[in-house]
Regions:
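Intrinsically disordered, low-complexity regions enriched in serine/threonine
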Residues: 1-3, 10, 57-61, 76-241
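Short acidic loop-to-beta-strand element that houses the catalytic metal-binding Asp/Glu
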Residues: 67-74, 86
Length: 241
């Protein structure tokens, strides 16, 4: 399984590692959300609401000595043999980002993540934080199957769209200009486009380019992972090159 966080200071971790990170102190106006409890509760609620889906795997990553966390739960069903429904989530102990949940898909062959729609964000960490979080989780999971179906349809459409090298490099410039791909990630996209690590992406299609980009986005910091994946999807799904 590929690591989610390979940028400087980021590291792959386990669920038990999340539990070992000390919680910051609670104040009158701020109640922290445990990385471990968020991951565990999200898996339990998803397992109860996603009927017909089976847990395929989980990935967790931390940065800033555990102050930032990003995770993905992936579920498999009969809709797609190559992709699974993914629930991405993030949290921080240093107030650098709020609890956020996004729905998408994971490509089984490479663990590349595709996200679409909006990020459900819990903006306040008050004394009722867990009631608010449970409502956020349930609402997001109820929308998840619709989002997953859309991503599967988008992926199929992208597979059918030919993309030559010149157009691919123009798109790469567009993604860089829109702060989706960083300067350090550009060589990764170029390498994965010209010489893919996986045979599944050897065809010259928008889908292959998409996965070259998501391979590079594995090095994005936790507070940018969701936004950059969603921006990538929004840019590539509407283009007709």
């Amino acid at each position: 399984m590929n690591e989610l966080l390979l940028h400087k200071g980021g590291e792959y971790c386990t669920l038990n590692d999340l539990r070992e990170v000390p919680l910051p102190p609670e104040t009158r106006t701020y109640r922290p959300v445990s990385h471990y409890d968020l991951a565990k509760n999200l898996a339990e609620v998803s397992g109860g609401l996603l009927r017909g889906y089976e847990m395929q795997g989980t990935q967790y990553g931390m940065a800033r000595d555990g102050a930032q966390m990003f995770g993905v739960h992936t579920y498999k069903n009969g809709i797609s043999g190559s992709m699974g429904l993914s629930v991405g989530f993030r949290n921080s102990y240093d107030k650098s980002m709020s609890v956020g949940i996004a729905i998408g898909a994971s490509v089984f062959v490479c663990d590349n993540l595709a996200l679409t729609g909006d990020i459900a964000i819990m903006r306040k960490h008050t004394q009722n934080v867990w009631n608010d979080l449970e409502e956020l989780i349930i609402t997001t999971i109820y929308r998840s199957q619709h989002n997953f179906t859309k991503i599967v349809e988008d992926a199929e459409e992208m597979r059918g769209r030919y993309l030559g090298n010149d157009d691919a490099f123009r798109l790469l410039g567009l993604l860089y200009g829109n702060d989706v791909i960083s300067p350090r990630q550009i060589p990764v996209v170029k390498k994965e486009w010209l010489s893919p690590s996986y045979d599944d992406f050897s065809s010259r299609s928008v889908w292959s380019f998409y996965n070259a980009c998501t391979e590079a986005l594995k090095t994005a910091p936790p507070n940018k992972i969701m936004e950059r994946h969603i921006a990538l999807h929004n840019i590539l799904e509407v283009r007709d090159d």
